[in-house]
Each structure stands twice: as C-alpha cells, then as structure tokens.
A protein has these predicted regions:
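Domain-terminus/edge residues, biased toward the C-terminal soluble/receptor-binding domains
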Residues: 2-6, 10-145
Length: 145
C-alpha cells in the first residue's frame, strides 16, 4: 500500500507534513481505475460545455482538460494533473495499448510541457518492455474432499 504518504488536506495544496511518493501515487491511481473503471469516461474528455442554471437563467461555460497527454498520446486514458510551488508540475498518467494498461507518474517537473513529455517517455519505455502473457497451460487446481 501507500507506505510513504501522509495527506493533511484533501485538496493537494502545499502544507507542512503533506507528502507522498510517485510509487504511492501509482498505487492510488491503480486502485482508482480498478475500482472505478468508468473514471476513464471522464478523464479522457478533452473539452466540454457546462450549463449552469439559476433563478436568473442559464449560462454556459467551457471546460478544458488540464491533462495535455490526452491530446498528445494516442493511448492516453487519463488521469490526474496537479501543480504547486513545492511539488512542481505533476501527472499521474494512464494509458491502454493493446489491452495493456500502464501508469506513469511524474512529479516536480519544471513545467507542464515537460511533465507530459516525461510521461510519454515513461509510457513508451513501459510499452517497449512489456507484453501480454497468456498461460497456455493454466494450473489445474485440486479439490480436496
């Protein structure tokens, strides 16, 4: 689990004692996508329009995804960007290529472009060294009476 993380707030802003590691962010991301795979239905949206309704009427405003990886990496499926003065530019990136799902985490990048470039490098490296394994001789389990 997340052995090197201590959150002191839920918003992710800098605070004394608020700390995590790239590995722990990857664990947290894995849990999120495993338990709630529908998150990709939202994290892959590039732009959308929201209608805000009040007694005075309706108003629309546009939202653009802060995760530029969605537009720059063919297999990107999400997931979460963030930046603070102490953490720098961070990204927990998920991708799915040939039914292989990978997570890449970049922390403390100097800017948004480099966090995306670093995630692309990590994902490309991962896809270059992994392949899907299919067990041609699945284990036969014995049943004991």
């Amino acid at each position: 689990g997340m052995m090197n993380t201590h959150f002191v707030n839920c918003c992710g802003l800098d605070a004394d004692g608020h700390e995590t590691t790239a590995r722990d962010v990857a664990y947290m991301s894995r849990e999120l996508i495993n338990k709630y795979p529908e998150i990709h239905n939202y994290s892959t949206i590039w732009m959308d329009t929201i209608t805000h309704s009040t007694r005075r009427g309706n108003s629309e405003f546009g939202l653009t995804n802060t995760n530029k990886l969605i537009k720059q990496y063919e297999w990107a499926t999400g997931l979460k960007t963030g930046s603070t003065s102490l953490a720098g530019f961070c990204l927990s990136a998920t991708a799915n290529k040939n039914d292989i799902e990978l997570i890449a985490v970049v922390m403390h990048a100097p800017n948004g472009k480099e966090r995306v470039a670093d995630c692309i490098s990590l994902l490309n490296y991962g896809y270059g060294i992994v392949s899907r394994y299919e067990d041609v001789n699945p284990r036969k389990y014995l049943k004991f009476a």
